[in-house]
Design a protein with these regions (language model features):
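Conserved beta-hairpin
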Residues: 12-50, 105-137, 144-146, 151
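Acidic, Ser/Thr- and proline-rich intrinsically disordered linker/docking segments
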Residues: 50-114, 140-186
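Hydrophobic alpha-helical transmembrane segments
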Residues: 1-5
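Helical transmembrane-bundle signal
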Residues: 6-10
Length: 186
């Protein structure tokens, strides 16, 4: 029940805190280096397949949101950063999103140009528009994207429509760039 769940969560938190007590991240123009327990892992921006950034409200009101940033590389490896073991994860994730935007956007644009569908969690995009599961909404009807209260929302025909939990939508920064470009072209 609830007690067992809390015990498992507490155990996992202790494990992660111990594992990441010496965690260091260095950001460079072409990627970053993650050092854990003396082992370096180099992650190039062009090797990243997805970035997911979630801000969760802490149970401790004064502390503010807790950030979790997850990178997945094209070889399937995942790397996570959280405020529990690293300072300023929100700023780190912003730098990661800035570094990965161009390579990810180029890959998505090539796939769209080839007529493919590209998924972003619970939604997908095509060259014609956004597919929310009930047909394609043309790009000209999609005005903006935002994250609020842990939800991703699109402005469609002037009204905000929730499309999914932020934790389920990878590469929001790429989706945001696609929406902005569609608005500029429309």
């Amino acid at each position: 029940g609830f007690g067992l769940g809390m015990l498992v969560l507490a155990g996992w938190s202790l494990y992660v805190a111990r594992r990441d007590r010496d965690l260091r991240v260095r950001v460079y123009d072409n990627g970053l280096v993650v050092t854990r327990a003396g082992d370096d892992r180099v992650i190039r921006w062009d090797a990243v397949a997805s970035v997911n950034h979630v801000a969760m409200q802490s149970l401790r009101v004064r502390r503010g949101p807790t950030h979790l940033c997850t990178l997945k590389t094209r070889d399937g490896a995942a790397t996570q950063f959280s405020d529990a073991t690293l300072q300023n994860v929100a700023g780190l994730c912003e730098r990661i999103q800035a570094g990965t935007l161009d390579p990810l956007l180029r890959r998505v644009a090539a796939r769209l140009q080839a007529g493919e569908r590209v998924t972003f969690g619970p939604l997908a995009v095509t060259s014609q528009g956004v597919d929310l599961g009930r047909g394609i909404v043309p790009w000209v009807r999609v005005g903006a994207i935002r994250e609020a209260d842990g939800q991703i929302a699109l402005r469609i025909d002037g009204a905000w429509r929730k499309v999914g939990a932020a934790g389920r939508v990878d590469n929001v920064h790429v989706l945001s760039a696609l929406v902005a470009k569609a608005g500029a072209d429309g």
